[in-house]
């Protein structure tokens, strides 16, 4: 994901000019699996580690098990390309049930009454809806469908997974693949990290009795209304249980928390020193500001700072 590459450049300029950072934006699923083989010092993921992945990390961490530290918050945009709407800079209003039905192939036309009734001011065409989803294992996918599971479970009965669960629409690899595919054809709809949306149209999502447009600020309001998940296994972990059903004013409920995943101890002391210095930087006020400037992310809640510092301090450098 380009945010880590961009932050890496800032980190080198401002903190450690001699650091050599090689970043492969392969997606959360591939990144975690590469980390669990011991091929990388750390991984970035848009979902927390599963319990079996924590257990598996014993084979790559010199001591203990890997842990996840929140590094940024980003809303997930429901993006679309619809002639006369997205190219006119207009949003389309939708509630959770409508979005879920579209991605489950139950709503197939843009002028379906379920959409039209929520958009009285728009003249929606009789254009077929083409769903675009991730073809690869993806934390963004899991966060996206978690919203359906929490808010409109009757309309989304699939098991929660990083893999897209149905045969509706067409798959595209990575965030860039989804964005590129949506841009190529009229009538398309997909989902992607807000930082990558560009000039595509976005859905304003219903929260309570209002439709809220996507923004970093709106996404951060959901996390402020969420709690830590105290059921996860492993030490030093900070995992947010996102409250997708929030009715906080001005909030945008489809959001992800991105984590950096590290070991508490490494065979190579230099790797440990880098992991500790990197996490210290990206979770600092300076690092959070750099992320916000680079990709429009929302800063982490101040309430997490002391726990994040404690987790980072658990990395042994001697």
Task: Go through each PLM region and give its residues.
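Single conserved hydrophobic/aromatic residue that forms the stacking wall/gate
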Residues: 1-11
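Pocket-flanking alpha-helical
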Residues: 15, 22, 28-64, 78-80, ...
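Extracytoplasmic
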Residues: 16-18, 30, 40, 64-66, ...
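Ligand-binding pocket segment of bilobal, Venus flytrap-like solute-binding proteins
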Residues: 32-34, 41, 137-232
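A conserved helix-loop-strand patch within extracytoplasmic ligand-binding domains
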Residues: 63-131
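Short helix-loop capping/hinge motifs at secondary-structure junctions, enriched
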Residues: 83-92, 109, 137-140, 154, ...
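Extracellular/periplasmic juxtamembrane helices and adjacent flexible linkers that interface
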Residues: 119-127, 242-318
